[in-house]
A protein has these predicted regions:
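FMN-binding flavodoxin-like domain, especially the glycine-rich phosphate-binding loop
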Residues: 23-30, 45-188
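Short acidic low-complexity segments
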Residues: 30-42
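Short, surface-exposed connector motifs at secondary-structure boundaries
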Residues: 1-2, 75
Length: 188
């Protein structure tokens, strides 16, 4: 099986998660910045990682997802964000990545907290959105992703790859309840 791990990372958070995922893959594999990827057509499965920007994928990330996630290609999404994983506001933001990747067979999705960049926090603190201003003020993301979160990414990668080897991978859960249950189980 040929596997691609590709990521977009401005601050290094998503790159760290990509590297943790990559470490656990024993099949033929490549890791690259998403900007270096022309196509995912020649891979059996692609792990694609992005940070959340302004409550979802930024325009570049959305375009890349729409470009690569076509024809039912098997894709695993991994997303980093400054919010804690149990944040009530997070699921709709993650859904925006699923929508952008809707042409793919989304095998699974992983998300974890990453450290909010200081310049981004300053920008968020003056935006019109009260929610974003509050997040900037209440930021608790220093040092993320930590060892525990990176270990979770490694375990997630092993689980996905084991499922593929066993031909038991299913399309990512669609209902909010199923996604919440999956997120809780993936932390255990």
């Amino acid at each position: 099986m040929k596997v691609l791990v590709a990521y977009m990372s401005k601050t290094g958070n998503t790159r760290k998660v990509a590297e943790a995922i990559f470490e656990e893959i024993t099949d033929e594999k490549e890791i690259r910045s998403i900007d270096e990827v022309d196509s995912i057509e020649n891979y059996d499965i692609s792990f694609l990682g992005f940070p959340i920007h302004m409550e979802g994928p930024d325009k570049k990330a959305a375009r890349l997802l729409e470009k690569h996630c076509i024809n039912g290609r098997k894709v695993v999404l991994f997303i980093t964000h400054a919010a804690p994983e149990d944040s009530e506001e997070l699921p709709p933001m993650l859904d925006k990545f699923r929508v952008a990747a809707r042409g793919a067979n989304i095998v699974d999705m992983f998300d974890c907290q990453g450290q909010l960049d200081k310049s981004t926090r300053r920008i968020m603190s003056v935006l019109p959105s009260a929610k974003l201003r509050r997040w900037a003020k209440e930021d608790n993301s220093t040092g993320q992703p930590d060892k525990t979160r990176l270990d979770r990414a490694r375990a997630f990668s092993r689980s996905v790859m084991d499922g593929l080897q066993d031909d038991r991978v299913e399309v990512c859960a669609e209902s909010q309840e199923e996604r919440d249950e999956h997120r809780i189980l993936s932390r255990v």
